[in-house]
């Protein structure tokens, strides 16, 4: 066999584990295999009703003229999501015959899942992640369930979040800020990206433009709140309730601690402190590499409008890793996680394990443990311990390692 033939021959190991060596097994082709699989899920696996009816009842009240968030009530209670959620599910209300055509809704969510998976695959290609990372992504049982069998708004939130990350990696900053705010208008979980995003904006664009982007994010939120301005306080306290109590019954991540600790103020204060400490630590060691500025210097730059020094350019790999890490830190320190929240971070966790310089077998093993933990229902002490330990191990390794460079 000639040397040319050897170079051009298909090597499955190289395709799976080499940087950017996707060959003919490109993510777009792999996505085609998802189509019959998704059809099979919809036709063979029973749909599980959790929040869809409540969403439709709340939308129906909105369409009948109710604008007080505390009075937009469904079978599971009052509406607790921002205006973007209302507009989105109003559209779904019309597309699904008032919410009665569940199968049509499932196909819509399947399409959202497919598009989100394609976007993440494109992101992986941009940062030259090995192909096995993408294979792990589409094998996730829980992600398929969240989108296709549960119809949670977390699916649309992850779609807009993925578009936000993609726009950031392409340095389309205005588009990124708008998409981040749109994602937050569906579910405020996307606020977890904000710390790293602001650090990136400040170092890349300077303080004046960073303030401009903050105003863009706020303006988008105000636009979504316009229909509810007559009940201003009701809207903002319901849609962005940071003091919301969580039921120990549904926690995925803290089952291994006693209920008394879970419900205590000291516990919530402790994990909030840990959250802030980790954000500061990553800012000091990793996210500030573009300027080598301290957090105090960054705050001073924002207040005085004096730009930070620019020591190096931001690569897509650096931007992607910083944003995904900021999000994962929030997941680790979350007051409580429910099963649908898996869509907030599962797309990027294998890539972060890879970025933490774990070898492929460890990356795959951590992903398998994570999938196990998030597919145990109800959660157990073991599954919740795993659900906390996997992001903890990933974050600690990310902190102590230098990011891979494609």
Curated annotation (Swiss-Prot):
GO terms for cellular component: endoplasmic reticulum; lumenal side of endoplasmic reticulum membrane. The chain crosses the membrane at residues 72-92, 107-127, 129-149, 186-206, 214-234, 261-281, 313-333, 349-369, 376-396. Keywords: Endoplasmic reticulum, Glycosyltransferase, Membrane, Transferase, Transmembrane, Transmembrane helix. GO terms for molecular function: dol-P-Man:Man(5)GlcNAc(2)-PP-Dol alpha-1,3-mannosyltransferase activity. It catalyses: an alpha-D-Man-(1->2)-alpha-D-Man-(1->2)-alpha-D-Man-(1->3)-[alpha-D-Man-(1->6)]-beta-D-Man-(1->4)-beta-D-GlcNAc-(1->4)-alpha-D-GlcNAc-diphospho-di-trans,poly-cis-dolichol + a di-trans,poly-cis-dolichyl beta-D-mannosyl phosphate = an alpha-D-Man-(1->2)-alpha-D-Man-(1->2)-alpha-D-Man-(1->3)-[alpha-D-Man-(1->3)-alpha-D-Man-(1->6)]-beta-D-Man-(1->4)-beta-D-GlcNAc-(1->4)-alpha-D-GlcNAc-diphospho-di-trans,poly-cis-dolichol + a di-trans,poly-cis-dolichyl phosphate + H(+). The keyword Ligase does not apply. It is found in: Endoplasmic reticulum membrane. Its EC number is 2.4.1.258. The keyword Transferase applies. InterPro entries: Glycosyltransferase_ALG3. It is a multi-pass membrane protein. Pathway: Protein modification; protein glycosylation. GO terms for biological process: dolichol-linked oligosaccharide biosynthetic process; protein glycosylation; protein N-linked glycosylation via asparagine. It holds the Pfam family ALG3. It comes from the Eukaryota. Its main location: endoplasmic reticulum. PANTHER family: DOL-P-MAN:MAN(5)GLCNAC(2)-PP-DOL ALPHA-1,3-MANNOSYLTRANSFERASE, NOT56 - RELATED. Dol-P-Man:Man(5)GlcNAc(2)-PP-Dol alpha-1,3-mannosyltransferase that operates in the biosynthetic pathway of dolichol-linked oligosaccharides, the glycan precursors employed in protein asparagine (N)-glycosylation. The assembly of dolichol-linked oligosaccharides begins on the cytosolic side of the endoplasmic reticulum membrane and finishes in its lumen. The sequential addition of sugars to dolichol pyrophosphate produces dolichol-linked oligosaccharides containing fourteen sugars, including two GlcNAcs, nine mannoses and three glucoses. Belongs to the glycosyltransferase ALG3 family. This is Dol-P-Man:Man(5)GlcNAc(2)-PP-Dol alpha-1,3-mannosyltransferase. It comes from Schizosaccharomyces pombe (strain 972 / ATCC 24843). The gene is alg3.
